[in-house]
Amino acid sequence: VVYGSSILQGASASRPGMAYPARLSRSSGYNFINLGLSGNGKMEKEVAEMLADIDADAFILDCIPNPSPKEITDRTVDFVMTLRQKHPDTPIIVIQTLIRETGNFNQKARENVKRQNEAIAEQVEVLRKKNVKNLYFIKEDQFLGTDHEGTVDGTHPNDLGFDRMLKKYKLAISKILKIKFKAE
């Protein structure tokens, strides 16, 4: 199960099959369920309870674009622990939000993304100190590239942006879940 934002949903992909969960499914043979909730991936307790009812092999939390840094700080531990209660051994993968092109000309947006990524890194560390096992963290690493061609609007990946994200995500996910991905 992959939970997150409009980015995950594939809001600006040329077609639904170009969003990264669909492409992960095609290249692995596993079903990556896309629960991208355009603008609403805010880690609410009720959503955690709903996700916990799903018999999943793994949970990928790619929701950091939507909540504020304060919401991330206030909600992450409870969200992960709600999943962990029903899935004590299931891998949980947390992904930082991608750096948005809009931050190149909007300093407030740039600072918000920086604070979101710092907040989620801090909360993952809190969870690790609580000995939450099978918790993984994918740090933002130029997910969209550096040539300013990976989005349609400075935020949402186009097909090229999804290609670039997918390459980085596949490397991490294949190591964590021991999945072999085929070339697309």
Ranges and model annotations:
Residues 20, 75, 79, 116-123:
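A general structural detector for well-ordered alpha-helical segments in enzyme core domains, enriched
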Residues 16, 24, 41-86, 97-104:
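Oxyanion-hole/transition-state-stabilizing segment in secreted/luminal serine hydrolases
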Residues 60-62, 84-115, 138-147:
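Active-site segments of SGNH/GDSL-like serine hydrolases
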Residues 1-37, 41, 45-55:
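Serine-esterase "nucleophile elbow" of acetyl-processing enzymes
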Residues 100-138, 164, 183:
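Substrate-gating cap/lid alpha-helix
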Residues 152-184:
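Histidine-centered active-site loop/cap adjacent to the catalytic His
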Residues 63-69, 107-113, 152-156:
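The substrate-binding groove and active-site-proximal loops of carbohydrate-active enzymes
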Residues 28-33, 55-58, 88-92, 132-135:
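Loop/turn elements at helix/coil->beta-strand transitions in domains of secreted/extracellular proteins
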